[in-house]
């Protein structure tokens, strides 16, 4: 290999390393900007200023503001969806895995609090703004199936919507609150116990109401 080729390879490696460093600076800066202002109000110049890079360097790394948001959120979304799928299958096969699944999910969300908050509350105006609604609909479907199983009929849709909204709000409080991982896991377990007991009491009440209406 000639000296010229060696020099070219070294230069290429150095350029790649600088580009990666620039991208990481922009991702850190963008994460903070999106968390503070939300996607719609986040300013590219402020992101670049905080990262100490030029706007030209930004566009060399990312096509636009949404591409930066994608670099921040896509991996977390992929991991979250994979974990939900794996955990659902595990619990179906062995309900005793629920506590361990809850722990793993809380550990992951604790490590990615900022991304979770941006995704659920700060992504309006981006292609991710429907993610919260998607989660909401999935939970409504799961709640409806569960209630139907024990009631023999479909529950009131508005009741399910409110119950899901309350459950999601509880999860967001855990994510946003200044808790340790262990505290989040404990609180999630206690909230779950309360929710399970309340759900069964509600189903019993609703079944009783059905009997009253029959008479």
Question: Predicted regions span which residues?
Answer:
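N-terminal intrinsically disordered/low-complexity leader segments
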Residues: 1-19, 207-215
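Helix-turn-helix
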Residues: 25, 29, 33-67, 71
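Short, basic, alpha-helical segments at the C-terminal edge of helix-turn-helix-like DNA-binding modules
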Residues: 44, 74-81
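Alpha-helical DNA-contacting segments of helix-turn-helix folds
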Residues: 62, 69-76, 119, 128-132
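Hydrophobic alpha-helical connector segments
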Residues: 71, 85-111
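Amphipathic alpha-helical packing segments from all-alpha helical-bundle domains
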Residues: 81-84, 104-107, 111, 125-151, ...
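Short linear capping/connector segments at secondary-structure termini
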Residues: 85-90, 118-126
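Hydrophobic/aromatic-rich alpha-helical bundle segments in the mid-to-C-terminal region
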Residues: 117-121, 147-215
């Amino acid at each position: 290999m000639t000296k010229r080729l060696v020099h070219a390879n070294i230069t290429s490696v150095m350029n790649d390393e600088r580009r990666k460093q620039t991208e990481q600076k922009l991702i850190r800066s963008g994460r903070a900007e999106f968390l503070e202002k939300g996607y719609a109000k986040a300013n590219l110049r402020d992101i670049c200023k905080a990262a100490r890079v030029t706007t030209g360097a930004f566009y060399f790394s990312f096509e636009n503001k949404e591409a930066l948001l994608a670099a921040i959120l896509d991996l977390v979304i992929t991991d979250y969806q994979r974990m939900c799928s794996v955990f659902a299958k595990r619990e179906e096969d062995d309900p005793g895995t629920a506590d361990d699944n809850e722990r793993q999910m809380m550990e992951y969300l604790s490590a990615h609090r900022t991304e979770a908050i941006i995704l659920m509350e700060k992504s309006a105006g981006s292609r991710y703004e429907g993610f919260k609604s998607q989660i909401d609909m999935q939970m409504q479907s799961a709640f409806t199936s569960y209630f139907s199983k024990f009631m023999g009929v479909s529950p009131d849709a508005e009741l399910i919507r409110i119950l899901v909204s309350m459950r999601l709000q509880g999860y967001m409080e855990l994510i946003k609150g200044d808790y340790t991982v262990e505290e989040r896991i404990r609180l999630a377990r206690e909230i779950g116990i309360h929710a399970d007991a309340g759900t069964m009491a509600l189903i019993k009440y609703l079944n009783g109401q059905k009997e009253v209406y029959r008479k």
